[in-house]
Each structure stands twice: as structure tokens, then as C-alpha cells.
């Protein structure tokens, strides 16, 4: 299975007072979509931070809608999307159950997750564990695991919950959006937040 992994599109990014939507549209429409078509991609992954903020401008939402439609409806390629720390999980989850049969798998709110996304190729099933960014308190409440107090414990709980639904021997891909310990700050316009964890479960 040929999987194209992407992340951090940050659609609707405002850079020194200017929206980058036109530039982002060029990259997605003139580079990403032809790559999906020409390279025989079997599945596209967007691992979080679809938008630059939880309430994105309308132009950014329209761009994502257009690109997602072209990937799934025109190119007939499954598109798996999870929310990141910049996204609104509730907004990203909108109509997710309706869209999944069309090949657009949106994982935002934990309450709406039903388990791994399973795709097929000539070698059989591939299970995708879709793990959106979630604070430990949200994971603790949704999974009913009172012991979850840290981001590492939250990730381990989510991976354990989804992974337990995958039969032995099935190829598995983890799609997650999370902080990683040991990050180094750069001269970006916003300070980086380096909080978190490494996990044996990952």
C-alpha cells in the first residue's frame, strides 16, 4: 500500500498580516493532487493541524473542502484526517459518519471515534489507528480511565483502546498528532511548546 503522509497544513495561516491561502491552494492543487494521481497513491493521511486555528476563515474551509473532494471523489483515494492542537475537534468531526463511506475519514472528537479505519489492498487489510490530539482530561473522561494524568498516559490509553480492536497479524499504521519531548525552539513567529512524551506503545 502506497501511503502519502502529510501533516500541519495550517490552512488559513496569517503571516505578518497576510493570509497564505492563495499560496497554500497552489501547493495543494498544483503539487499535492498531481502527486497523488501520478504516484499511484492508495491512501492520503493528514496527521493534524488541518487549520491554523480552531475557527478558520471561510476561504480556508472552502480550500479544504475542495481538496478533500478532489482526493476522494475525483481521484477515488481514501483520505484520513485527524485533528491537531490547532484544530477544533468538534468542527473537524462534523458529518464524519456521513463522509466515511465516501472515503473521507475525519477523526476529531474522541466521543465519535469508533475504532481503527480499515482499508484493503491486494495483500489484505491495513488498520489505521487514528489518534487525534487530545488533552489527558478528555481522554480520561472519554475512556473512563481515571489513571490517565499525563500526555504519555493519554497516548498509551488511546493506542491501547484502538489497537485492541485490531486482529493479530493485521498490518497496522498509527496516525497521531502529539507533542514530543526534546524539541528545540526555533526563530518561528510563535514560541514552540515542548511538553511531552515518548511512549513504548508507539
Over which residues does each language-model region extend?
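Conserved small/polar residues in nucleotide/adenosyl-binding loops
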Residues: 197-202
Amino acid at each position: 500500500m502506497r501511503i502519502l503522509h502529510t501533516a500541519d497544513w495550517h490552512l488559513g495561516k496569517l503571516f505578518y498580516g497576510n493570509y497564505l491561502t492563495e499560496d497554500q491552494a497552489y501547493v495543494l492543487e498544483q503539487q499535492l493532487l498531481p502527486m497523488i494521481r501520478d504516484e499511484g497513491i492508495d491512501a492520503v493521511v493528514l496527521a493534524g493541524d488541518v487549520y491554523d486555528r480552531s475557527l478558520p476563515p471561510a476561504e480556508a474551509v472552502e480550500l479544504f473542502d475542495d481538496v478533500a473532494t478532489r482526493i476522494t471523489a475525483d481521484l477515488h483515494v481514501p483520505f484520513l484526517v485527524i485533528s491537531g492542537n490547532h484544530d477544533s475537534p468538534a468542527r473537524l468531526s462534523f458529518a464524519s459518519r456521513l463522509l466515511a463511506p465516501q472515503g473521507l475519514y475525519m477523526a476529531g472528537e474522541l466521543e465519535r471515534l469508533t475504532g481503527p479505519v480499515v482499508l484493503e489492498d491486494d495483500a489484505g487489510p491495513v488498520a489505521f489507528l487514528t489518534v487525534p490530539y487530545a488533552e489527558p482530561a478528555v481522554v480520561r473522561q472519554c475512556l473512563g480511565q481515571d489513571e490517565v494524568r499525563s500526555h504519555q498516559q493519554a497516548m498509551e490509553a488511546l493506542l491501547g483502546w484502538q489497537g485492541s480492536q485490531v486482529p493479530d497479524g493485521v498490518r497496522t499504521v498509527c496516525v497521531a498528532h502529539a507533542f514530543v519531548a526534546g524539541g528545540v525552539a526555533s526563530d518561528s513567529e510563535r514560541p514552540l511548546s515542548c511538553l511531552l512524551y515518548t511512549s513504548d506503545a508507539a
